[in-house]
Structures are given as structure tokens and as C-alpha cells.
Amino acid sequence: MQSELQRGFVLHRRPYSETSLLVDLFTEESGRLTVIAKGARAKRSSWKSVLQPFTPLLLRWTGKSTLKTLTKAEPAAITLPLQQIALYSGFYVNELLTRVIESETPNPALFQHYLKCLTGLATETNVEPTLRLFEFQLLQMLGYGVDFLHCAGSGEPVDFSMTYRYREEKGFVASLVKDNLTFYGRDLLAFEALDFSDDAVRQAAKRFTRIALKPYLGDKPLKSRELFTQNILLLK
């Protein structure tokens, strides 16, 4: 069965036989799926240059199984110019999607968040606000629900100047203990507003999303994070 023409992006690609590629796609209407791009590794294949991350594509495929066969791939726009830290950040976002969202689960809203994230990475000087916003949006799409506005212990509204300790599957409880699981009330209020304009809030948000995403990612390290760490000196 031939699919409708859809907008999408390449998340990851790897060799499949001598002449083909196995490609993870993220599409607007069908979500994440894996396709075989037959002949894409051949010298004269036009797909070799087209099937690249961060290039908006128009795609069509066929097949009823979980592994589809790509039948059409053409650029819908120019490749988003991600360079240096923005490029590694793009790899990180792609790996997140590959690891945490279920295959063939339509999510047009998440596709729009992803598109805005890539655009932000390509245009903004500081990539951190863009990354933190996408991580929180991804958590929302995964059904992750936590109340940033109330103390999980007392039900009282979060106080701007107090500290709260995160408890998995429960929320934030007022606490005088300060460790990796502790956040200021002002951080939680900013999280609720998706306001990552302040540097201290961004650092707290990064710490929180690592905690919140761990159950979805498991113990396997993110390759994109390792790659960034290995090359960080070259980026400075």
C-alpha cells in the first residue's frame, strides 16, 4: 500500500546491504518509521545526498510491515544550516526522538515542535533555550504529567523562594535538603510557563529533563552526548 506524500526528516541512517540504506524517518502524519532506501548507496543514486538529517523532505513509501520501502524522497526546502554546537544539538534531538517515541504513532503537534526546534537551532546564538523548550514539549507529548505549581506534600502553591525536592511519580515536595533532586520554587514556576530566558532556570531545567527522561531512555548512554563530549574542545 502506497502512502500519501508526507513532509518529514531523516533522524538516522545506516548501511543496509551493499547498495541500500536503512533510514529512520520522522514524518508529520505517520510519526517515526523505518524504511529501506533501495540503491541509495549506489554511486549514481540521487538519494545519497537527499537523505540527510535536517533537510525538510517530501516522502512516500510502501509496505504493510513495520519495515517499509521508500519510493520517493525529494527536498521540500534547503537543509537547515546547523553548525558546531547547533549541529551536535540537532543530533541529540534526533536521537531523543529515535529512542523515546513509539514507531508509527502519528503526532503532528510534536512534528511542529521539532521543526521549530531545528529552526531555532539554526538561527539562535544560544541553543540552550531552544533545547530546553523542546525537551519539555517532548515530555508533555509522552504523557509525562507533573504539577509545577503545587507542593505534592501539602497541596500549597509553590513559593518562589523555597526549595522543593523531586520525587518520581509524586511531584515536588518542600524540602530543606539540597541535592541534585532539589529545585527552587522560581525554577518550577518558570518550568510551568516554559520560560527559559534565565540562565539559572536553564541549568535547572537541563538537570530536571535528564531526570525525567531517564525512565524513557533507560541506562543506555546517548551517543550524541558522548560525541559532543569528545569534540567539545574543538568547538571552543
UniProtKB/Swiss-Prot annotation:
Protein name per Swiss-Prot or TrEMBL: DNA repair protein RecO
Record keywords, A-Z: DNA damage, DNA recombination, DNA repair
Gene Ontology BP annotations: DNA recombination; double-strand break repair
Originating organism: Haemophilus influenzae (strain 86-028NP)
SUPFAM superfamilies with a match to the protein in the record: ArfGap/RecO-like zinc finger, Nucleic acid-binding proteins
Organism superkingdom: Bacteria
UniProt record similarity statement: Belongs to the RecO family.
Function: Involved in DNA repair and RecF pathway recombination.
Record InterPro entries: ARFGAP/RecO (IPR037278), DNA_rep/recomb_RecO_N (IPR022572), NA-bd_OB-fold (IPR012340), RecO (IPR003717), RecO_C (IPR042242)
Transmembrane segments: none
